[in-house]
Regions:
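Short glycine/acidic-rich loop motifs that flank beta-strands on beta-rich extracellular proteins
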Residues: 1, 16-22, 43-49, 66-72, ...
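Alpha-helical transmembrane segments
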Residues: 189-202
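Juxtamembrane amphipathic/hinge helix adjacent to a transmembrane helix
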Residues: 104-110, 135-171
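Cytoplasmic C-terminal tails of single-pass
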Residues: 201-219
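Surface-exposed loop/turn motifs in large extracellular/passenger domains
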Residues: 1-8, 23-35, 51-58, 75-88
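Acidic, glycine-anchored loop motifs typical of Ca2+
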Residues: 98-116
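Juxtamembrane/start-of-transmembrane alpha-helix segments at the extracytoplasmic/lumenal side
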Residues: 165-189
Length: 219
């Protein structure tokens, strides 16, 4: 529960939920701003109660989260702002287009997958994410609009590109010398074990000696 909160330029990667909003902001006429954040490879990018309102999202990147946005139970997140001053967010599963090349999609981004709506009500169903059953349900909702659930999120100005936060982009990815030394040692041990298995050393091995008896010629 917070007020006067601004969450900017964070990288949230590989968590159960990138951000969870319960009752923020608390006071009326207060807006919480999420700007320039990087939510990637989480189970859920942003999760909130359906009653949550007045949260503004601008310039965030939602990258390959199993579920980009989720409500806890029935409802939606439409009482929040998913674009500010004509600038929305980047969504990795957005399939729209940018006809005028301004970097903003001409088609709104919507979170309205049938299987995701079911998992919001029945979380245990997430075990079947990416299963043939979940894909079939989503395909059926696309083919038959009457099955399509109400959207939970509508971003009217989705971004076509995203920017990696500076503190991630500048991370030195060059392997250290100690890492290389340990790797070479492990490779050497692995090679020695392989050769020993392929050509085992036989100890105390003696070749059999064959003896031949000779009989003298009888006179």
């Amino acid at each position: 529960d917070s007020n006067y909160l601004s969450v900017e330029n964070n990288a949230v990667i590989g968590n159960q939920s990138g951000v969870y909003i319960d009752n923020s902001p608390m006071l009326p006429d207060i807006i919480t701003l999420f700007k320039g954040n990087f939510f990637a490879y989480n189970d859920v990018g942003v999760s909130a109660l359906p009653s949550v309102a007045r949260n503004a999202f601008q310039g965030n990147a939602f990258i390959d989260n199993l579920q980009q946005a989720s409500t806890l139970g029935r409802g939606n997140l439409l009482k929040n702002m998913w674009q500010v001053d004509g600038v929305g967010n980047y969504w990795s599963d957005y399939v729209g287009y940018d006809s005028d090349g301004d970097g903003i999609g001409n088609v709104s981004y919507r979170v309205e997958k049938l299987f995701e709506s079911l998992t919001d009500e029945y979380p245990l169903l997430r075990l079947f994410t990416y299963s043939p059953a979940s894909q079939s349900l989503n395909f059926a909702a696309v083919a038959f609009p009457s099955l399509r659930p109400d959207p939970k999120v509508i971003d009217e100005a989705p971004l076509m590109h995203y920017t990696i936060p500076a503190h991630i982009a500048q991370t030195d990815s060059t392997p250290s010398m100690s890492f290389l030394v340990v790797s070479l040692i492990l490779l050497g041990l692995g090679g020695a074990i392989f050769l020993f298995t392929l050509y085992p050393i036989r100890l105390n091995h003696t070749a059999p000696i064959t003896t031949h008896e000779t009989q003298g010629a009888k006179s």
